[in-house]
């Protein structure tokens, strides 16, 4: 089996090891094979030396959180995220390597009504204690409220799949904050639900491309696109690479994380009260991929005293579906984050990504979305 990776990108790594301290799986295991350098060595063996795609190789790749914390640390600019996505694409092409229940779950994400129905069943099952706590799910709402209303055409508010099913309150908060800075918003039309981020993580590239094309078609024009999920925002900003078209490139240039969009307009916010101290947790795809973690601090500083963690943005272990697929490693990685949160002191943690929020909340952390906190102060 050949991985079909870019030879130049794969050959860029000089094995310096500067990535190792930034890799969550290496930090908790100390295993070279579970580091970016070790995984690239395994990719090279398959790509250049026709090594067998063994069970060990699959394990090395599937245990990667895809946090991409190694990329900013790499002096050679190795595009590790793209290499891992390409490798996962090859592995996913062999259906024997992807369990049926995983494929079913990813298909549900692309069909919004099925996701909403499934979420309601999960919420009901939680009340009856039929859903195992080890799944790490937050307490899901039995009633999610009305969809986010459109107020005008200044910007698009991307609603997504999981966020719309589980966190409509955050969409309403985001719309409230946008209105407070004199920006009206509207939600995507048909097809603008799932962005395909989890599909890319799983290597289901064809499915991700199909979803991306639908999302692009759901938000025409040149209005900015505001996204309040870090994982979704990173995916939308990467559509140019995913689809390789000028239309996708132009679309990606319109995408902003919610805090990234609001920060330059912060002086317009009519703050009515200040909140207590808030600790900031940086979602990996906001910090390492979008490089948009600083605006979160700008926005939160307008309503609260911001407290920093001392772990330099190390991954929390959520990784999209990672905490469900690799619960043991995800739990070990989370323990390091919990220790850092404990040292920070304040009881409220702000996270701009649902996966991170749910993963931390499952361990008892009080997590709020930055937009929810800002809206509360208005």
Residue ranges and their predicted role:
Residues 1-10, 50-61, 180-185, 301-306:
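Short, intrinsically disordered, charge-biased short linear motifs at domain edges
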Residues 2, 26-59, 77-103, 366-374:
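Non-heme iron-sulfur electron-transfer modules
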Residues 11, 30-34, 199-206:
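Alpha-helix capping and helix-loop boundary segments enriched in small/acidic/polar residues
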Residues 80-378:
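Iron-sulfur cluster-binding electron-transfer modules in prokaryotic oxidoreductases
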């Amino acid at each position: 089996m050949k991985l079909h990776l870019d030879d130049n990108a794969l050959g860029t790594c000089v094995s310096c090891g500067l990535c190792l301290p930034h890799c969550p799986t290496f930090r908790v295991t100390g295993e070279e094979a579970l580091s970016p350098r070790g995984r690239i060595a395994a990719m090279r063996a398959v790509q250049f030396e026709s090594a067998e795609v063994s069970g060990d190789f699959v394990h090395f790749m599937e245990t990667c959180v895809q946090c991409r914390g190694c990329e900013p640390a790499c002096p050679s600019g190795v595009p590790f995220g793209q290499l891992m996505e390409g490798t996962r694409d090859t592995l996913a092409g062999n259906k024997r390597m992807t369990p049926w229940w995983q494929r079913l779950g990813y298909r549900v994400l692309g069909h919004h009504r099925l996701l909403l129905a499934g979420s309601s069943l999960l919420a009901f099952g939680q009340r009856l204690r039929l859903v195992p706590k080890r799944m790490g799910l937050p307490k899901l709402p039995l009633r999610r409220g009305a969809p986010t209303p459109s107020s005008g055409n200044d910007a698009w508010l991307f609603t997504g799949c999981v966020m719309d099913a589980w966190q409509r309150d955050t969409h309403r908060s985001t719309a409230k904050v946008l209105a407070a800075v004199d920006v009206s918003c509207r939600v995507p039309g048909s097809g603008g639900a799932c962005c395909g981020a989890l599909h890319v993580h799983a290597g289901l590239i064809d499915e991700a491309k199909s979803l991306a094309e639908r999302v692009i078609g759901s938000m025409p024009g040149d209005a900015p696109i505001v996204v309040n999920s870090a994982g979704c925002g990173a995916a939308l900003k990467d559509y140019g690479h995913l689809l390789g078209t000028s239309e996708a490139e132009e679309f990606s240039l319109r995408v902003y994380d919610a805090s990234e969009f609001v920060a330059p307009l912060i002086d317009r916010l009519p703050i009515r009260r200040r909140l207590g101290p808030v600790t900031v947790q940086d979602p990996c795809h906001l910090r390492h991929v979008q490089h948009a973690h600083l605006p979160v601090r700008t926005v939160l500083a307008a309503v609260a005293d911001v407290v920093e963690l001392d772990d330099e943005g190390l991954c929390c272990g959520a990784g999209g579906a990672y905490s469900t697929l690799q619960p043991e490693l995800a739990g070990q990685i989370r323990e390091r984050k919990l220790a850092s949160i404990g040292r920070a002191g304040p009881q409220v943690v702000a996270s701009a990504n649902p996966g991170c929020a749910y993963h931390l909340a499952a361990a008892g952390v009080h997590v709020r979305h930055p937009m929810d906190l800002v809206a509360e102060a208005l």
